[in-house]
């Protein structure tokens, strides 16, 4: 059975027989020896394999290996005298599993731009940067689940196909399959924009729940910050107010950041050196300080008083743009910032109305380099007020009767938030374009495989 390189690198070199399988990164020949750099994807670090002319296929195959070829190596793991590596494998056999023609294989031994790699998204995981993103993304996902499980939350699998538009913005992809009455599900259905409403169903029965899954927006935004398909982390907590919501969100973010810094050292060093210099120090600073907090009204006043010229004019009642959010986090507070109590007119119907009748108990967490990372609120638990806001938003109360029933039978204060997973991966890795942090980006005009 093959052993992962990441495990062999920390093993004691007691001249044990091992099997390594992976892809050739480089080959160099010296006299009667070939030095193969093999990577199996378990770590950024390659395993050096030393093959000599005593191998039966040395001249015919080993000396013809090139970048991208796949091999199975058996040999003895030994302590390496070479600088920068702890162990190496002295091969007793090298089996070529698959060839890669160096004339046509697009990933040769040189640095490729991230824009070029997007054009070959089926091969880009074989590069250092994108494989490192994949491992960090996996670890972040693991840490998210660990956090909520340790907190006693129950994971709920909310539907991908739904007849409800949580955001009420009409940006849903429609499901086209039809039945005898014209609609397969008996009503117009689309791909979910959020699992929040369904998560509220289970929060008002199980207490604390979370959902973590794909969401979809038919928004024609071809920017470095938007995707048509992305993943969302959405907890919902019964008997919880906005204060509790903010505390859980900040605690969760710090938990997953600490986890990645501990377990993805090699990959994070790559990002720190080649992608975003100082990213590790910036993340450590996030862990060391409380998030700043300010109301929307105070934030607008600070922007107006700054003298800064923005592309989008600032006034009370606007939806803060990325340039406003980044100015606040990067220039004013220089750390993550929680903005609360937004105007009701720019927020969805389900957010709890504040006593002033103008703002809602909402919060956004803004982070340097990204802008909005988390959006949450205390939900409106009062039947009459919720029904009034739904009517004002043009929603059919009969169609959303199930949602109103949660307030009709045993209503409780509850709160939750949504965290865009790809933006979290961006924040951690320092990647400038969101297309680099999801395995298969879906954007307007682009869905290659």
Swiss-Prot record:
It catalyses: tRNA(Asn) + L-asparagine + ATP = L-asparaginyl-tRNA(Asn) + AMP + diphosphate + H(+). SUPFAM superfamilies: Class II aaRS and biotin synthetases, Nucleic acid-binding proteins. Keywords: Aminoacyl-tRNA synthetase, ATP-binding, Cytoplasm, Ligase, Nucleotide-binding, Protein biosynthesis. PROSITE patterns: AA_TRNA_LIGASE_II (PS50862). GO terms for biological process: asparaginyl-tRNA aminoacylation. Coiled coil: none annotated. InterPro entries: Aa-tRNA-synt_II, aa-tRNA-synth_II, aa-tRNA-synth_II/BPL/LPL, Asn-tRNA-ligase, Asp/Asn-tRNA-synth_IIb, NA-bd_OB-fold, NA-bd_OB_tRNA. It is found in: Cytoplasm. One of its GO terms (cellular component) is cytoplasm. Its EC number is 6.1.1.22. The keyword RNA-binding does not apply. Belongs to the class-II aminoacyl-tRNA synthetase family. NCBIfam families: asnS, PRK03932.1. This is Asparagine--tRNA ligase. It comes from Desulfotalea psychrophila (strain LSv54 / DSM 12343). The lineage of its organism: Bacteria, Pseudomonadati, Thermodesulfobacteriota, Desulfobulbia, Desulfobulbales. The gene is asnS.
């Amino acid at each position: 059975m093959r052993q992962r390189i990441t495990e062999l690198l920390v093993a004691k070199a007691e001249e044990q027989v091992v099997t390594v399988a992976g892809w050739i990164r480089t080959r160099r020949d010296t006299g009667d020896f070939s030095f193969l750099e093999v990577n199996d994807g378990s770590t950024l670090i390659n395993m050096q394999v030393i093959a000599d002319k005593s191998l039966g296929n040395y001249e015919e195959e080993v000396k013809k290996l090139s970048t991208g070829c796949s091999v199975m190596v058996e040999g003895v793991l030994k302590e390496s005298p070479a600088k920068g590596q702890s162990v190496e494998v002295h091969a007793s056999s090298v089996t070529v599993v698959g060839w890669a023609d160096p004339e046509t294989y697009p990933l040769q031994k040189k640095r490729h731009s991230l824009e070029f790699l997007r054009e070959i998204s089926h091969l880009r995981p074989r590069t250092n940067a994108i494989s490192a993103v994949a491992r960090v993304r996996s670890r972040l996902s693991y840490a998210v689940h660990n956090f909520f499980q340790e907190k006693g939350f129950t994971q709920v699998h909310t539907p991908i196909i739904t007849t409800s538009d949580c955001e009420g913005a009409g940006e849903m992809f429609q499901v086209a399959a039809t039945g005898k009455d014209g609609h397969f599900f008996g009503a117009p259905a689309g791909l979910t924009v959020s699992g929040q409403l369904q998560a509220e169903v289970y929060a008002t029965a199980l207490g604390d729940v979370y959902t973590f899954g794909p969401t979809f927006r038919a928004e024609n935004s071809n920017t470095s910050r938007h995707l048509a398909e992305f993943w969302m982390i959405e907890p919902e907590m019964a008997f919880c107010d906005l204060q509790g919501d903010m505390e859980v969100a900040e605690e969760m973010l710090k938990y997953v950041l600490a986890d990645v810094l501990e377990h993805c050292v090699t990959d994070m060093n790559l990002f720190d050196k080649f992608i975003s210099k100082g990213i590790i120090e910036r993340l450590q600073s996030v862990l060391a300080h409380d998030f700043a907090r300010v109301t929307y009204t105070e934030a607008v006043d600070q922007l107006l008083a700054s003298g800064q010229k923005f592309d989008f004019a600032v006034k009370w009642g606007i939806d803060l743009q990325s340039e406003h959010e980044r100015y606040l986090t990067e220039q004013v507070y220089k750390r993550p910032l929680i903005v609360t109590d937004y105007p009701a007119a720019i927020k969805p119907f389900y957010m709890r109305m504040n006593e002033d009748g103008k703002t809602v108990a909402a919060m956004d967490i803004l982070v340097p380099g990204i802008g909005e990372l988390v959006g949450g609120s205390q939900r409106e638990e009062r039947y009459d007020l919720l029904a009034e806001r739904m009517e004002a938003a043009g929603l059919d109360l009969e169609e959303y009767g199930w949602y109103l029933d949660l307030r009709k039978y045993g209503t409780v204060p509850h709160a939750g938030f949504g965290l865009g997973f790809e933006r979290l991966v961006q924040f951690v890795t320092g990647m400038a374009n969101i297309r680099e942090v999801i395995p298969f980006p879906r954007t307007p005009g682009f869905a290659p495989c």
